[in-house]
């Protein structure tokens, strides 16, 4: 019964209004308020501040600065295995596997469309059909910056409007097409192994998503927006393996997609595996 009520609430709640209100609180600079909020959050979720560049909780100008905190140099060493594909973020593997019949496995009999995930453009999604995907869920205590699994040249960024369902095991098992329904930012790259997509998926109370090249990516009008970054227009924008790609102001999920015969995921990783940014996610197929 509790689960049914929770899922019902997900459909009834004003997702964007709640998220924007919480976003305003997260940017509050009133000293006593932001300090209490940060201290409560760090204690509640057992955040490890020993690896943060700034360990003093009161030194952050607002909650979002704390939430998107930088780590000390060396806190996330990058796997140096030849051909390594790096994990883009701290968190847990939600699912990983093959993109079969144009769909990605979600949970418990649910799947979602790769074409819809990438903004509804079949041509954009075509290079990934029959390829591989990995979904990484970032919990509240995790480091919330997302990094490049491989070096790449940015080709296109797509803002896709949508709902802001909470992202957790319960919603994954009960909300059809969850990741293809939530607001998201699609980042498409060319790499030495072919096309790569990194999708930053929003969720309830995720006030915004940022990328290192565009800053805040939440257009005032909630309509799909595509921006190309080829050499003739805005580019090229090149990011090294392990470089920061973007960040969540209150977290959610990162999904990585590759084309067919590009990568093989690490055998020890399965749904539920805890991961850290920079560790081995998979290997390039030579």
From Swiss-Prot:
| Post-translational modification Pyruvic acid (Ser), affected residues | 252
Q: What is its EC number?
A: 4.1.1.65
* Annotated positions for site Cleavage (non-hydrolytic): 251-252
Q: In its UniProt record, which GO terms are filed under biological process?
A: phosphatidylethanolamine biosynthetic process
Per UniProt, subcellular location reads as:
Cell membrane
Q: Which keywords, in A-to-Z order, does the entry hold? A: Cell membrane, Decarboxylase, Lipid biosynthesis, Lipid metabolism, Lyase, Membrane, Phospholipid biosynthesis, Phospholipid metabolism, Pyruvate, Zymogen
Q: Which cofactor does it need?
A: pyruvate
Q: Which reaction does it catalyse?
A: a 1,2-diacyl-sn-glycero-3-phospho-L-serine + H(+) = a 1,2-diacyl-sn-glycero-3-phosphoethanolamine + CO2
On cofactor binding, the record's note says: Binds 1 pyruvoyl group covalently per subunit.
**GO CC terms, sorted:** plasma membrane
Q: Does the entry feature the keyword Membrane, yes or no?
A: yes
User: A Gene Ontology molecular-function term?
Assistant: phosphatidylserine decarboxylase activity
Membrane topology per record? Peripheral membrane protein
Query: Which Pfam families does UniProt cross-reference here?
Result: PS_Dcarbxylase
> Which family, according to the similarity comment?
Belongs to the phosphatidylserine decarboxylase family. PSD-B subfamily. Prokaryotic type I sub-subfamily.
Tell me the function of this protein.
Catalyzes the formation of phosphatidylethanolamine (PtdEtn) from phosphatidylserine (PtdSer).
Q: Please give the name of this protein.
A: Phosphatidylserine decarboxylase proenzyme
Instruction: List the source organism.
Output: Ectopseudomonas mendocina (strain ymp)
Its ancestry begins with: Bacteria, Pseudomonadati, Pseudomonadota, Gammaproteobacteria, Pseudomonadales
**The encoding gene:** psd
